[in-house]
Amino acid sequence: MLNVEKKMENGALFIALEGELDTLSSPDFEAELEPLLAEANSITIDFEKLGYISSAGLRVLLAAEQAMEEKGAEQVKVIHLNDTIRNIFSITGFEDILSLE
C-alpha cells in the first residue's frame, strides 16, 4: 500500500510517499503524478516513510525525470532515502539520474 501526499506551490511540486512503491501501487502513483508534470518546474519526492521500491517504482521515477528533462526543468530530487533504497539507487545507476539528498 502506498500513501501519497502532494503539494504544489509556485510550480514546485513536493510529494511525500509512505509505504511501498511496488508493482501494485506504481500505476496509481504514475496516474496521480502524470497530470502534475505539465505544471511543475521542480519535483521533490520525500522517501522518509517509504519502505520499499521495486523496478516498477523506479520506472515511474525515470519517466518523471525524462518529462522534466524534455521541458528543460530541474532534475527530480529525492530526499530522505533509507540505506536499503539508497543502495538500490546505487546498484541501478539511479544515483546518477536523479538528485539524491
Each language-model region and where it sits:
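Amphipathic alpha-helical interaction surfaces in cytosolic regulatory modules
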Residues: 23-97
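Short acidic-hydrophobic, aromatic-tinged amphipathic segments that line or gate anion-handling sites
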Residues: 99-101
